[in-house]
Amino acid sequence: MSFDGKQLAHEILLTYKNRDWSQVKLVILQTNNDVSSDAFIRQKMNACNTLGAQSELIKYHESVTEKELLEKIQQLNTDPEVTGIILQLPVYPHLKQNKLLKAIDPYKDVDYLTGNCPLPIRSCVVEAVLILKEHFHHDFTNKQIVVVGLGVTGGGPIFHYLKETGHQVVGCDKHTPNTMELIKTADVVITAIGKPHFFKTTNFKPGVILYDVGVSRNVLNKLCGDIDPNGIEKVAKWWSPTPGGVGPFTVLAIMKNLWVLYEAHQRRI
């Protein structure tokens, strides 16, 4: 079973419109020339527009210095009109990604990439998977779960969340020698390696549940997931396509987190 994630996420997003978003503001800092990032940013800004929230994109040239960015982040941290800050990844190679992320005020870290926000929010990719899990009634109890790819914006947060919540989960990266063997016996596979159609139908057991978090472009510059969709419906009980699968729900999660940050800010005024 597959589904239209874009439509479903939009329907859920519309249920948030009963709140007053007029004083909510999201600022996105872009320090890359990545086409996929451009698409993700548009989705986030469109979601803000749908709900009536404010959004601002600040795009930097490759000549930007780390000092300039840190000063800008500090300015946004202290601006009472800014609710949430996103540093769109990846960053230019000469910039220290972790240093920039750590500079963001935890109370404005809408992506939860610092992991330091004391408010009840989660990493957007984790929240996206959990929204889908709940909506489609996927029970992970006593299931063998394999997460492939442990990057900071993809499989890493998902793996750590599942491990911390007591699930039977194994994390695989490029150093794992038996990844394919683990996948073949897994009940749930979550892929986040960013390689177009890397996994085939033959890699999975019948009845598997597949969350495809990876995003990349093939030789034709077409947006793809990690899992080849050709024939996958014959093996998988359920799978999320790319594009239009997990991605729209990460945007939904950002808006969900943004509202929590806004409410917390209002309480502190």
Swiss-Prot record:
Cited InterPro entries: Aminoacid_DH-like_N_sf, NAD(P)-bd_dom_sf, THF_DH/CycHdrlase, THF_DH/CycHdrlase_cat_dom, THF_DH/CycHdrlase_CS, THF_DH/CycHdrlase_NAD-bd_dom
Keyword Amino-acid biosynthesis set for record: yes
GO annotation, cellular component aspect: cytosol
PROSITE patterns per the UniProt record, alphabetical: THF_DHG_CYH_1, THF_DHG_CYH_2
Any single GO BP term: purine nucleotide biosynthetic process
E.C. designation(s): 1.5.1.5, 3.5.4.9
MF annotations from Gene Ontology: methenyltetrahydrofolate cyclohydrolase activity; methylenetetrahydrofolate dehydrogenase (NADP+) activity
Pfam families, A to Z: THF_DHG_CYH, THF_DHG_CYH_C
Pathway field: One-carbon metabolism; tetrahydrofolate interconversion
UniProt keywords, alphabetically: Amino-acid biosynthesis, Histidine biosynthesis, Hydrolase, Methionine biosynthesis, Multifunctional enzyme, NADP, One-carbon metabolism, Oxidoreductase, Purine biosynthesis
Binding site for NADP(+): G149, L150, G151, V215
Assembly and interaction partners: Homodimer.
Role: Catalyzes the oxidation of 5,10-methylenetetrahydrofolate to 5,10-methenyltetrahydrofolate and then the hydrolysis of 5,10-methenyltetrahydrofolate to 10-formyltetrahydrofolate.
Family listed: Belongs to the tetrahydrofolate dehydrogenase/cyclohydrolase family.
Protein name as it appears in the record: Bifunctional protein FolD
Source organism of this protein record: Mycoplasma pneumoniae (strain ATCC 29342 / M129 / Subtype 1) (Mycoplasmoides pneumoniae)
The encoding gene: folD
